[in-house]
Amino acid sequence: MKVTKADIVISAVKPEQYPDSDLPEIALAGRSNVGKSSFINKILNRKKLVRISSKPGKTQTLNFFLINEMMHFVDVPGYGYAKVSKSERAAWGKMIETYFTTREQLDAAVLVVDLRHQPTSDDVMMYDFLKHYEIPTIIIATKADKIPKGKWQKHLKVVKETLAVEIGDEIVLFSSETGLGKEEAWKAIHKFTKTKNA
């Protein structure tokens, strides 16, 4: 998809701050510093729309981005960062649970994982959470450029088996460096969104 417009609309922490809109939404989740911001910037053809932080756990709000006036991307705070306090972690959990369980506009989630490593227990927990609430999920296995092409399938198998990926959910090999998987990611997103304008 050609992205001609991408703007941040609001950073929200509670439902009354969510955009008053019927546009479909795609939530983007992933471990702190897994490469989620780089994925968003790459797929939207923007260098710095989402700030890439050297400090994990920096995003503490739900950031809504309006894409081509036709859908919202919702950047969810990264999880699994050890230095976040228990109270912050509890607030984070409540905020995302409220969003995922009450937002009717949510069509699917994108879960970004690092292809180089076996998904963590936090990744498994996040995927299980999404499946518990029957949210269609696209798994973006990023940093594919850091692994020899001949080993991609072996690493993908580990991701699939560790997460116990359900039938119907898609896994896309991705690289924010080379752009590998960009078209496939958009195809998967359009498959789940109510808007079919490619």
Swiss-Prot record:
NCBIfam families: GTPase_YsxC
Alphabetically ordered keywords of this record: Cell cycle, Cell division, GTP-binding, Magnesium, Metal-binding, Nucleotide-binding, Septation
Matching SUPFAM superfamilies: P-loop containing nucleoside triphosphate hydrolases
Matches recorded under HAMAP family: GTPase_EngB
Any one GO biological process: division septum assembly
Domain of life, per lineage: Bacteria
Name the record gives this protein: Probable GTP-binding protein EngB
List of residues binding GTP: 30-37, 57-61, 75-78, 142-145, 174-176
Cofactor(s) the protein requires to work: Mg(2+)
Protein task: Necessary for normal cell division and for the maintenance of normal septation.
Binding site for Mg(2+): 37, 59
Cellular component GO terms held in the UniProt record: cytosol
Organism the protein comes from: Bacillus cereus (strain ATCC 14579 / DSM 31 / CCUG 7414 / JCM 2152 / NBRC 15305 / NCIMB 9373 / NCTC 2599 / NRRL B-3711)
Molecular functions per Gene Ontology: GTP binding; metal ion binding
Residue ranges annotated for the EngB-type G domain, each copy included: 22-195
Family recorded in the similarity comment: Belongs to the TRAFAC class TrmE-Era-EngA-EngB-Septin-like GTPase superfamily. EngB GTPase family.
